[in-house]
């Protein structure tokens, strides 16, 4: 009779845990794909994941972590930041991967440099979106990109983003929109 070593037992348990985590993640992603608003958000992450630069990405305002999970297929290192402890806890439980670091500590972002920064549906919820764009722009590597999305109804953001890009020398690389409803669209822009 073959006895199982502690190491073999640990590896079997780890494999079951990882498989369970991945299955949960895929179940959540399937639910997201069925929701019109969240599906539009998913498309923004898919576009950012298709970027040519594939080293480090910051998912600022990562929420529950599903966008970071999508980005982790295309980038060597993903930092998912959100100030909400409950959301970060959920992300760590359901969307953990070796190449993802979820944090709620904004101080950890200081001094780091990223190839891509994603700000999907974040700017309408921050007090000073121009200041946040300026701060995050300094975290970009020289050839980096910032991907931004917001609802078309948030027209004031267009002025803030345009002013920021002109002051900081960022150029609009691409822009698109996707319908959420008869009245609303998600606007997506990439600056480099």
Predicted segments with their positions:
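Conserved N-terminal segment of class I S-adenosyl-L-methionine
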Residues: 5-76, 80-107
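A short glycine-rich, Lys/Arg-flanked "PGG" loop and its adjoining helix->strand segment in the class I
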Residues: 130-142
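Core SAM-dependent methyltransferase catalytic element
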Residues: 179-192
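Short alpha-helix
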Residues: 155-168
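Conserved beta-strand signature within the Rossmann-like core of class I S-adenosyl-L-methionine
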Residues: 143-151
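Short catalytic micro-motifs in class I SAM-dependent methyltransferases
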Residues: 121-122
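Conserved S-adenosyl-L-methionine
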Residues: 170-180
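A conserved beta-strand element that flanks and buttresses the S-adenosyl-L-methionine
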Residues: 118
